[in-house]
Amino acid sequence: MPYTITYQPAEDGEYVGQAIFSIEAFSLGEGYIVEPVLTDIYAGDCAAAVLMRVLNRFGFTESHTGSVEGGFYLATIKDGTIPNIPVSPGYAPAELVDALSSWGITLEDRYSENELGEFDYCYASGWMYCLNNVFPNVGFSDSYLSDGDVVRVQFTVAYGSDIGGGYAMGGSDNTSFYPVANKDRLSTLIATLNEHGIEIPDSAMNAATAIYASQEDVNAAAAVLQQLEDEYQQNAPVRDVIAKISAIGEVSLESASAIAEARQAYDALTVEQQALVSNYDVLTAAEETLRILIEELPVSASFSAPEIIALSGQQVEIPVTVSGKFEAHTLEMHIGYDSTKLTVNEVVPGAILENTSMNVIDFTTTPGTIYVGALCADAPMTGNGIDENVLLTVKATVNPEFSGTTPVNVDVNRM
C-alpha cells in the first residue's frame, strides 16, 4: 500500500524543540564549564546562534572568527560573571599527559586569566564540538539542530585526538589516544534532572566528567539517573497537589473552590503518594480557616415561585430557585419545594452551601396574601404571578465539605 509523506518545514523563528548543550574541559581535569542544559531551539537557528544564547545565559562572553551566519569558529570563552574558567593544567588526567608526551606535547602554564581558548597550554589546543556523538567536519554556523540533539562543546589539547575527535581534523579513526564513551544519554539525563532541580549523584557526575570513563561506567551512571527521572515522573500527581495547595495563598471565602480542588486532588492520591505531599498541613489549616469564616457569615437569601398551578390539601412540588449572597460570594441552588420542607436537589458547582438542606420552621403572612407553606387549604386555590411578599423563617444547615455542621437562622424573602 503506497503512502504519501508531506513535509512542511517550520517557519523561521518557530519553536522546534530543545537541544542539550554542555561546555566541557575534561582534558584539563576541570569538569564542566556549563553542565548539560536544555536549551530552546528555533527554526533557522544554526548551532552557533544557540551556543551564543547558552554562553550569555550563564554569564560568559566569547571571541570568535567568522560570523554566526557563516565561518564561525569559537576561539575563546571568557568569564563574564562566573569565576569557573579553568586556569591550571595541573589536574589533567595522567593517561592524557602520557599520551601527549608521545606526541612531544607538554602542557605549559600558558593561558590568560579567566578565559580559555585556542593555544592555551599547548599549540594543539582549542574548542571543538560533537553533535550526537559525532564530531562534524563543518563549523557551528553550518550545523542546524533538531529536537533532542546533544551538543557537547569540548576543549582539546591535541587537535581532538584526546577527546575522540581526531578524525574531524583530517586524521583517521585510529588517531584518538583512547576509546571515548558515548555520553549523549547521560548528558540528556543530567540536563533533564537539572531542569527538575534534582541533584545529580557524585558517582554519576564522576562518570560524566572522566574523560576516559568506560562505556560500562557511563551506562551504569545513566541507569541511576534514569531511575531518578522515572521516580520524578511517577510523582507528577504529588507535585500537582503540592502546587495546588501552594496556590491557595491567604484564605478568604473566594478560596473555597481552590481549597476544594486541592482536597479532591489530594484524596485521589495513593497512601504512599499522600505521604510525599510536603505541605499537607497548609491544606488542613486552610480548610479550618475557611470553616471558621463560613461559620461567622450572616446568611440571607431570597427565592421566588414563578407560578402556582394548584394548591389543595395535598402536598405539591413547585420548582423554585434559591439565590444567596455571602459578601462577594454568590451561590445558586436549585431546590424542590413541597408543603412541608425545602430540600436541595442540585447544587451549582462551587457553591459554598454544598449538600445543604433547608427546612421550614415557621412562616408569617399578611391578611389576603396568597402563600405556599406547610398547610392544608380548605379549598383548592389557583393563581398566577404571585405579587405579595411572604416572609418565611427557615433554618439552614451549613456543611461545606468539612467536619461538623453549623445551624444558621436564615430569613428568606419569598416573592
Model regions: which residues?
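Acidic, low-complexity intrinsically disordered segments
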Residues: R263, I292-M415
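A mature extracytoplasmic/lumenal domain signature
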Residues: I23-S27, V54, N133, F155-V157, ...
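Boundary/junction segments of secreted and surface-exposed precursor proteins
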Residues: T4, D12-I23, V238, I242, ...
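Ubiquitin-like/PB1-type beta-grasp interaction modules and other compact soluble beta-rich domains
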Residues: M1-Q233
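Extracellular/surface recognition and adhesion modules
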Residues: F21, L189, L193, A204, ...
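N-terminal exported-region signature
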Residues: V138, V238-K244, A258, I292
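Short, charged low-complexity linear motifs
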Residues: R110-N114, I242-S255
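Amphipathic, non-membrane alpha-helical rod segments
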Residues: E195-Y232, I248-E287
